[in-house]
Amino acid sequence: GDDIFFICDPGNYSLTYNLFGVENHMSPDDHYANLKRLIQAVAGRSHRMSVIMPSLYGGRQHRRVVRESLDCAVALQELQAMGVQNIITFDAHDPRLMNAVPLMSFDNVMPTYQVLKTLLQHMPELSFDKDHFIVISPDEGAISRNMYFSSVLGCNLGMFYKRRDYTRVVNGRNPIVAHEYLGESV
């Protein structure tokens, strides 16, 4: 058989389908179910199956808190059990997810060059000197990526820190008290 590549974008909510006369948008679960159907349809007929997933299914939730499921880890294990040998993704939220399938090829392509190239092409008026530009990381999880950007651009790095009031609960959540920049003042 031939090598088969499946492209599945679980974050694409623009696709719709009609269900009992109502237009529904495809959820990540719908995309993942369709991917499994396609894999089942060609299983045993291909030499090697690879899945290209720009954003991993369930990949934003990378650690278990209390009794939550780890959808991404389970999905990767399911795909491996179905015969998928390669997963290709872009900028995984937490690349440690590959530990769920240590015997399967897992390529995490970092699009940092493409991001900088597109930024410069579409905003040529930007000045990357320390007096006019700063890279801000939205949270601790993105700090390594933004450290790379600030190093390449030769500018300062800041980070949002979400200070929460843990004494109050609003709709089951702790409200954010303030956003503060850590690092040089902005």
Give the role of each language-model region.
Residues G1-V186:
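PRPP-associated nucleotide enzymes
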